[in-house]
Amino acid sequence: MNKKTFLKILTVLLFAPMSLFAQYPDVPKDLKAAADKMIDEENRYVDSVMTAGKTILANEAIHGKPYIPWAARPTDLPQARIPSFPGAEGGGQFSFGGRGGKVITVTSLADRGPGTLREACEGTVGARIVVFNVAGIIRLKTPIIIYAPYITIAGQTAPGDGVCVAGESFWVNTHDVVVRHMRFRRGETKVERRDDSFGGNPVGNIMIDHCTCMWGLDENISFYRHMFNPQDGRIDEKLPTVNVTIQNTISAQALDTYNHAFGSTLGGENCSFMRNLWANNAGRNPSIGWNGIFNFVNNVVYNWANRSVDGGDYTALYNIINNYYKPGALTPKNAPIGHRILKPESGRSKLGYLVFGRVYANGNIMEGNDAVTKDNWNGGVQVEEMENAGQYTDSMRWNTPFPKPEFPIMTAKESYDFVLNNVGANIPKRDIVDQRIIEQVRTGKAYYKEGLDSVEFYQFKHRRLAKDSYKNGIITDIRQVGGYPEYKGTPYIDTDKDGMPDAWEKANGLNPNDASDAVKDCTGDGYTNIEKYINAISTKKKVDWTNTKNNYDTLAKKGKLM
């Protein structure tokens, strides 16, 4: 190529529209304006509820449950005396959730109004425990945004097949939030609302357990930072999420409609992510979004395409311990990404040379690669475009774990079996969508709908993966895997409307005609009776839950509520 031709090409490239190279699509102004208006209106509504509830917030603060939206250190938020529930572990272990508050029963699948999940989350201020007496799909038209702190959402209480939140995002913009056995599958492909299934602006004391998060258009589930506006004319402050745990949870099959089939962005201060499954996400499995100690233990990562675990910055500390990596059909097995355990980033350093954070990586299995499995630093930890950490190894490699919350640790092989047997929203039951994901991880064979070769699904014009990638697990539209299943269930009888079925109350010596017994404690162990019901805790025997040796998942062991 001569110099004149090169200059012509360079000129064309310089003045070409940015959309030619854009990773993301252009959003029509009218659609963006409509989406922004929708979010603004929802925020104004929630703000009005919070303003009306100032007296309630002040009263809770007097009784040891203050509202602290500016929390930025683990010590900024008070900690409960006993775990959020038996089996809660990690950084979020001592979140209060809704303990001691009112019991709200979801009885409607509608987007908003009396008896809805939105009303329980957005329309109520004060500590609350949310239970379900309805089964089915909750189809949202706008995101649910939780601002009022101290809430427990107990998806395991739904009858029959349980519930699934669909259509829009579920945002946590507060602290002291406990969520168990919920399904968040957004499933929409609107260009103006490319957002997570489950995320938000989480402040801290977050405990997520046994949830299923799928079909997000940005990511499936992300918890790592929150933006705090001090309302004094300054710009928003970016603060870490503090005291956060995500355990026993699925992040799978993010939508690749716009090259963004991403699993999660995670992090914060005093954070723990253990016994989870990332499957069929092109990237961010997960990505690390903060520079605190990142504790990633006993997880399973399957069928990534261009990114496994990566992120952080030059000040980050990583505990990558006993995880199981299983390349899938879309993982480039002959490239460095095919056996990548971790790729730390050096971002935000203003030094004139590259600096990376410190890494403790040990006990991780890379299926199909004995060398990396034997020594995780033999190509498993990579920086820049290198096949390993190269000359940075000595400064990065740490031989002992960084300080982390105490919880039991399995081997990587044990964690593979445990995760596949236990992960996700499996009470009242594991649904067919989760079953298919688990089966693919086990066998390598993806489920997809036959006869779609001639169907035109929208795909971003610059999409990286092949059009038929859905046949190998990474999808652009939920119709490629059959969409939402049907959820059925018969409501239980709850005469006094206290969230506990009459049958359970009678079997456990409580009065089905006395709503006040829900917030009492029949054994004096610290868990209220409604907590005993939703977590399958004994009503006959007092257990010292302050003793960590007694901390086991009572609900998982029983496998059901009644």
Regions found by a protein language model. Give the residues of each.
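Acidic carboxylate motifs that coordinate Ca2+ or other divalent cations, activating on Asp/Glu
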Residues: D494-D498, D502, D525, N529
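Acidic Gly/Asp/Thr-rich repetitive segments characteristic of extracellular carbohydrate-active
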Residues: S84-V130
